[in-house]
């Protein structure tokens, strides 16, 4: 049997598909890749904030819904909290490091004033502004290779990226891992997900064999948070869960650049309940600070 996998045509997307494909090969399943151009690819120089939601996933998911592919593969942080009702999460791979990293000559504490750090994420911009208000940020688009090239050409004095991207691309840049209390990652950062059609029971059963349950539980808990308070590349909210045995350890943070709210939780339970509880904690604190009505 051969599975048709839809994904963006970028180098990183190809690597992510091949990571999943290797898991399929181990259970005797072949795969082929179907390259899809997304809105984010077609408007690669536009700020993400101007492109709307779902810019990395919509066209890829449509290929599955239209029967042109069997599976859509994404970096899970790029998919909306509300998945198309005809689609379902079939599997996730074991999580890569979920952290944000700083690529710069010095670590965060020792950065000079008035330098420019490249990031298009409002979450990263606000967290950085809260810690280091004297540092400037500037939007940066393009794949990881392009961003690093701009940094090396001194267009930026630093970059903030996802550590998982560098790991998957096997890049050996020196970097500084950012503390999760200072830079709480975007929900589902570091997770590769496979989406399929709900009705495809045969394919769904195949993907159960490669699913990493603890990672899926962490992902679902984080998604429960953002379904209550918002999240994604347009949101100033970060959330991270770590599951150890039956225990969930979670942190969620919000910042507008001037003030910061962080809440945490540690308890056993099911992902949705634990995530919802953390989301309600953050929502309560945001209301107390008059951030939301």
Curated annotation (Swiss-Prot):
It is an enzyme of class 2 (transferase). This is Probable porphobilinogen deaminase. The modification S-(dipyrrolylmethanemethyl)cysteine is found at residue 233. Keywords: Porphyrin biosynthesis, Transferase. It comes from Saccharolobus islandicus (strain M.14.25 / Kamchatka #1). Its cofactor is dipyrromethane. InterPro entries: HemC, Porphobilin_deaminase_cofac_BS, Porphobilin_deaminase_N, Porphobilinogen_deaminase_C, Porphobilinogen_deaminase_C_sf. Pathway: Porphyrin-containing compound metabolism; protoporphyrin-IX biosynthesis; coproporphyrinogen-III from 5-aminolevulinate: step 2/4. It catalyses: 4 porphobilinogen + H2O = hydroxymethylbilane + 4 NH4(+).
């Amino acid at each position: 049997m051969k599975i048709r996998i839809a994904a963006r045509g970028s180098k990183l997307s190809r690597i992510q598909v091949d990571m999943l494909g290797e898991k399929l090969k181990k259970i005797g399943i072949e795969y082929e890749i179907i390259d899809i151009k997304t809105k984010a690819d077609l408007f690669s120089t536009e700020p993400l904030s101007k492109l709307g939601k779902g810019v990395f996933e919509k066209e890829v998911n449509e290929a599955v819904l239209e029967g042109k592919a069997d599976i859509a593969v994404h970096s899970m942080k790029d998919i909306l909290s509300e998945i198309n009702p005809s689609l379902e999460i079939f599997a996730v791979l074991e999580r890569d490091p979920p952290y944000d990293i700083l690529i710069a000559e010095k670590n965060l504490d020792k950065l000079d004033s008035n330098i420019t750090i490249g990031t298009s994420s409002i979450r990263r911009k606000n967290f950085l502004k809260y810690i280091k208000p004297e540092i400037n940020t500037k939007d940066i688009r393009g794949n990881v290779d392009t961003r690093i090239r701009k940094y090396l050409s001194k267009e930026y004095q630093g970059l903030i990226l996802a550590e998982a991207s560098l790991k998957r691309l096997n890049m050996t840049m020196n970097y500084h891992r950012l503390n999760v209390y200072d830079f709480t990652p975007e929900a589902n950062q570091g997770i590769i997900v496979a989406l399929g059609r709900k009705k495809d029971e045969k394919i769904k059963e195949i993907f159960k064999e490669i699913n990493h349950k603890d990672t899926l539980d962490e992902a679902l808990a984080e998604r429960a948070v953002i379904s209550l308070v918002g999240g994604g590349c347009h949101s100033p909210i970060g959330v991270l869960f770590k599951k150890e045995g039956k225990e969930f350890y979670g942190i969620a943070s919000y910042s507008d650049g001037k003030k910061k709210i962080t809440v945490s939780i540690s308890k056993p339970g099911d992902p949705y309940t634990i995530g919802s509880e953390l989301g309600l904690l953050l929502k309560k604190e945001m209301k107390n600070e008059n951030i939301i009505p």
